[in-house]
């Protein structure tokens, strides 16, 4: 961008079922890399990026990609329409939409409530999402990423603003999913103690370059 390299010669191969931590300080390129993978950045189509065994930009739409990826970021709650219930927000995850514009099935409604019960928030199901504490909003958005059981999950600082008790609840959930599914998972955090134990691969960036991969 403007003659500045944001990402420089990144070579990263993520195999199905692997659990990766993406590390690096502010400005290291983590978010830019995730945007190249998941977002609709036009520069991504000029790079050698393969998703699910296929060159990005070889005919698939951005929705084809998003339907196979569960994603959560610290900013996501800002893009959701006000007034929709917690259950609505969770059900929107089935449709990869920012807000619920389809009519969910009874099964989807029930499944959404069961996910909330897993993290002890079942009593919040019918409340407007925007009245929740920010920590509870972030927990719900993690569930939204999980709910459609996608082959790839990307968590960009998912525990930002959570207290230690809620972090422990969410770590236990992600560990359970990592251990019992073949879902590929990428986790970004500035804090090592937030990383679920089952994430055993590490890519570290600094100034847009890979400094270690293990």
Predicted regions and their residues:
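Conserved structural motif at the start of ABC-family nucleotide-binding domains
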Residues: 6-9
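The feature captures the beta-strand-to-loop junction immediately N-terminal to the Walker
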Residues: 23-25
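Helix-to-loop junction immediately C-terminal to a conserved catalytic motif
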Residues: 38-39
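ABC ATPase NBD Q-loop/coupling interface
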Residues: 48-64
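ABC-family P-loop ATPase nucleotide-binding domains
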Residues: 74-131, 137
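Hydrophobic anchor residue at the start of the ABC signature
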Residues: 142
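A short, proline-enriched helix->beta-strand linker immediately N-terminal to the Walker B motif
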Residues: 147-151
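Catalytic Walker B motif of ABC-type/P-loop ATPase nucleotide-binding domains
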Residues: 153-157
């Amino acid at each position: 961008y403007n003659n500045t390299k944001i990402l420089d010669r990144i070579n990263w191969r993520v195999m199905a079922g692997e659990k990766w931590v993406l590390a690096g300080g502010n400005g290291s390129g983590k978010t830019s890399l995730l945007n190249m993978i998941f977002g609709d950045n036009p520069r991504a189509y000029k790079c050698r990026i393969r998703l699910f065994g296929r060159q990005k930009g070889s005919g698939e739409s951005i929705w084809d990609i998003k339907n196979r990826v569960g994603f959560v970021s610290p900013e996501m709650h800002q893009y959701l329409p006000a007034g929709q219930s917690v259950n609505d927000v969770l059900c929107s995850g089935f449709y990869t939409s920012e807000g619920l514009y389809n009519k969910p099935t009874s099964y989807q409604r029930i499944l959404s409530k069961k996910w909330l019960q897993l993290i002890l928030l079942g009593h919040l199901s019918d409340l407007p999402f925007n009245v929740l504490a920010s920590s509870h909003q972030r927990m719900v958005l993690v569930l939204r990423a999980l709910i459609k059981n996608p082959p790839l999950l990307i968590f960009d600082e998912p525990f930002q603003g959570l207290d230690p008790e809620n972090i422990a609840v969410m770590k236990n959930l992600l560990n359970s999913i990592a251990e019992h599914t073949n879902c590929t998972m990428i986790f970004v955090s500035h804090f090592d103690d937030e990383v679920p134990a089952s994430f055993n691969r590490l890519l570290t960036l600094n100034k847009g370059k890979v400094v270690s991969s293990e």
